Amino acid sequence: MLPKLELHHLQLIMTNKVILKKETQEILKNFATINSSILFRKGNKIKTISVGENAVAEYGCDEDFPQDFGIYDLTQFLNGLDLFTNDEKRKGVTEWTEPVLEFSNQSFVTIHGQGKAAGYTARYFFSSPEITLKAAPEKDITFPDSDMEFSIKPDDLASMTKAASAYKLPDLCFKSDEAGSITMEVCDREDPTCNVYAQKIKGHASGSYELYMKIDNIKIFAGGYDIKVSKNLITEWKHKSVNLKYYIALEP
């Protein structure tokens, strides 16, 4: 006989029901800043791509979606899910009760509450796949050989974006020298007299490079990252504690 928890999840799978975890909801909120629409594909990998096609994000989630479905306004969809996502204290410990998505129709999803929200349901209609198709890249990205590799802590990027706002600087520069030393700089590559905010980073580099990306293109989930930079004008940002990656283009 299966333990109660395993049986519960088996029943969810058999009835095409998915519990959407709080963590997945938070990552989807980040994805909504990259593209307001999304196409969920059958399985446990969620992808999105920016409208300008200069940033791709992919998340390997615990949920296993039973079908493809498109959401035109992802922020609206997530705001609706917040109605069913509550924190409840049990024996002094705060636990989240999360919404159950029931996929029994090709046109809409039925959302069920649990815990305090157990008596509530919602019906949310999918968008046409033709509308949201461009919001979900089908092919995986093959990253070329990296020319710089390093890690950053959560505070590192926060400091850089804060400096960019304070000094009104649009660019993030990755610099390396022949000795393999790496520096991240916030600057304006079009203005040689601009203010510069820099941080030396421990890592490895294959040579001397000076590669740029737009600060506005860095829309990532909070946390630490392992970063790869390629002279082929692409970067990979791999989250340290979540199965989450971003591929962000560098400027030519």
Predicted regions and their residues:
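DNA polymerase processivity clamps
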Residues: 3-124, 143-252
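Long, charge-dense
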Residues: 122, 127-144
